[in-house]
Amino acid sequence: MKASELRAKSAGELNQELLELLKAQFSLRMQLATQQLGNTSQLGKVRRDIARVRTLLQEKAVQK
């Protein structure tokens, strides 16, 4: 997910996206623990997406 796509979203939409990403991260961690995860790079991608969303939420909070 690109930062430019995220910047177009509102704070509410970003919070919703963050919740979805956190659920996905939890699911991937459980798959990793049970050795069902084939592509471990997905964990890093989701982690970076979470960081992007949190950064944009913080930027929006500072702008207010």
Curated annotation (Swiss-Prot):
* Molecular function via GO: structural constituent of ribosome
PANTHER family for the chain? 60S RIBOSOMAL PROTEIN L35/50S RIBOSOMAL PROTEIN L29, LARGE RIBOSOMAL SUBUNIT PROTEIN UL29C
Q: Which UniProt keyword terms apply here?
A: Ribonucleoprotein, Ribosomal protein
Q: State the organism's lineage.
A: Bacteria, Pseudomonadati, Pseudomonadota, Betaproteobacteria, Rhodocyclales
Q: Which biological process, per GO, is one annotated for this protein?
A: translation
Please give an example of a GO cellular component term from this record: cytosolic large ribosomal subunit
Cysteines joined through disulfide linkages = none
Q: What is this protein called?
A: Large ribosomal subunit protein uL29
Q: Which organism is it from?
A: Aromatoleum aromaticum (strain DSM 19018 / LMG 30748 / EbN1) (Azoarcus sp. (strain EbN1))
> SUPFAM superfamilies of this UniProt entry?
Ribosomal protein L29 (L29p)
Q: So what family is this one in?
A: Belongs to the universal ribosomal protein uL29 family.
